[in-house]
UniProtKB/Swiss-Prot annotation:
It is found in: Cytoplasm. One of its GO terms (biological process) is DNA repair. Coiled coil: none annotated. This is Protein RecA. It comes from Clavibacter michiganensis subsp. michiganensis (strain NCPPB 382). Belongs to the RecA family. Signal peptide: none annotated.
């Protein structure tokens, strides 16, 4: 048997050959310092960013968002698109349902002039377009709305009533095998919006399942179950929904955490409402009776007035959000001493927002 030194030398020779043939970093040691911090795209809700454990949706990964109709799936993805664009990124929306409302997207902060949109005729066309965009190395976020609307070409060209068992599941399985490597190389996040279906004849457990087969469940690094739990009212008028999101799968942090936030009609996720809720929970915002105060200054009487105050004073909202994320370890404290002792515990990994300059060519 070869000695330890010979084995180590053979390994180094093999690694050098792999680097020459496939590029530097094709194989690396898991504990090496060459790995970059986890880069993320914020969701628009600080509660959901915290529940995800890394501060947002991970870059270079597949994310599935599913739930009942009108639960906020598209709203959540539009907020993610707006945040990616604000950080200098480029986003694409593949509208297989042909239902994207540009005016609503604009109200949520999406730059509709910069957003790439495709309305494909078939599922094959939609996934091929997505693959080409990812491999360009220039896209930060791709959204496909929805998996259920990715109809195989054979089904579209066939007759009504024809049986096409398993076609969509095979299409998704093949596409995901191709997409996964490209997403990781280009650090592109891909969000699949999905619909719920019911399994017939299920008496034990949940009868709910998602469209498109099982492949997406395996390939997704994050799966989010979004539900509407309450209607928000101003007097007798409905003004929005209270929404709960459960992280049912998470390869980046512990799963099964939940987040609740408000979605207001016409304006989307109430970021300021989430900041007030989390601020009170973590004693950054003080609540005394009906009054909310921050750093000695009154925000307002009642949650709605306090929310409006933060909306009109975005610098205060940003300060509260930063303090929440620092306290929960999602970002480093900018005021921390730079030259900490070498034997001190390492600081939490910073959740880095996407930047156009960070993109790599495929």
């Amino acid at each position: 048997m070869a000695s330890s030194a010979d084995r180590e030398k053979s390994l180094e020779t093999a690694l050098a050959q792999i680097d020459r043939q496939f590029g530097k970093g094709s194989v690396m040691r898991l504990g090496s310092d060459e790995r970059a911090p986890v880069a993320v795209i914020p969701t628009g809700s600080v509660a959901l960013d915290v529940a995800l454990g890394i501060g947002g949706l991970p870059r270079g990964r597949i994310v599935e968002i599913y739930g009942p109709e009108s639960s906020g799936k598209t709203t959540l993805t539009l907020h993610a698109i707006a945040n990616a664009q604000r950080a200098g990124g480029i986003a694409a929306f593949i509208d297989a349902e042909h239902a994207l409302d540009p005016e609503y997207a604009k109200k949520l902060g999406v730059d509709i002039d910069a957003l790439l949109v495709s309305q494909p005729d078939t599922g094959e066309q939609a996934l091929e377009i997505a693959d080409m965009l990812v491999r360009s190395g220039s896209i930060d976020l791709v959204v496909i709305d929805s998996v259920a609307a990715l109809v195989p070409r054979a089904e579209i060209e066939g007759e009504m009533g024809d049986s096409h068992v398993g076609l969509q599941a095979r299409l998704m399985s093949q596409a995901l095998r191709k997409l996964t490597g490209g997403l990781n190389q280009t650090q592109t996040t891909m969000i699949f919006i999905n619909q719920l279906r019911e399994k017939i004849g299920v008496f034990f457990g949940s009868p709910e399942t998602t469209a498109g087969g099982k492949a997406l469940k395996f390939y997704a690094s994050v799966r989010l179950d979004i539900r509407r739990i309450e209607t928000l009212k101003d007097g007798t008028d409905a003004v929005g929904n209270r929404t709960r999101v459960k992280v049912v799968k998470n390869k980046m942090a512990p799963p099964f955490k939940q987040a609740e936030f408000d979605i207001l009609y016409g304006t989307g996720i109430s970021r300021e409402g989430s900041l007030i809720d989390f601020g009170v929970e973590h004693e950054i915002v003080r609540k005394s009776g009906a009054w909310y105060t921050y750093d000695g200054d009154q925000l307002g009487q009642g949650k709605e007035n306090s929310r409006k105050h933060l909306l009109n004073n975005p610098e205060i909202a940003a300060e509260i959000e930063q303090k929440i994320k620092v306290k929960l370890g999602l970002v480093k404290d900018p005021n921390a001493v730079a030259d900490a002792p070498a034997d001190s515990a390492p600081a939490p990994v910073a959740a880095v927002a996407p930047k156009a300059s960070a993109r790599k060519s495929a």
